[in-house]
From Swiss-Prot:
GO terms for molecular function: nickel cation binding; urease activity. It is found in: Cytoplasm. Heterotrimer of UreA (gamma), UreB (beta) and UreC (alpha) subunits. Three heterotrimers associate to form the active enzyme. Its EC number is 3.5.1.5. The gene is ureA. One of its GO terms (cellular component) is cytoplasm. It catalyses: urea + 2 H2O + H(+) = hydrogencarbonate + 2 NH4(+). Pfam families: Urease_gamma (PF00547). Keywords: Cytoplasm, Hydrolase. GO terms for biological process: urea catabolic process. This is Urease subunit gamma.
Amino acid sequence: MELTPREKDKLFLFTAALLAERRKARGLKLNYPEAVALISAAVLEGARDGKTVAQLMSEGREVLTRADVMDGVPEMISDIQVEATFPDGTKLVTVHQPIA
C-alpha cells in the first residue's frame, strides 16, 4: 500500500487518537500529545461527516474537559490547528482554547 506523507500523518494521528480514547475510557487522564490527537481526530472526522468549519471550531472545545487531562495540559494548548478535507476542499480549522 502506497501512502502519501499527508495520508501517513493522518493515519498516525488516528492511531494516537484511538490510544487516547482507550486510555480515557479506562479513566486515565490524558497527556499533551494524547489530548491534541483526540481533538484533532474529532475535527478531521467531523469534516468528513460534512460539518462546517464553524461547527468544528465550536465542537472541538467540547471534546475534552479539564477533568479529562493531566494538570497543566489545558494551559499548554492555546490553539489547535487542523487541515481538514471538506466536500468543497481543504480548509484550516482552528480550535481556540480547546480544553475549558
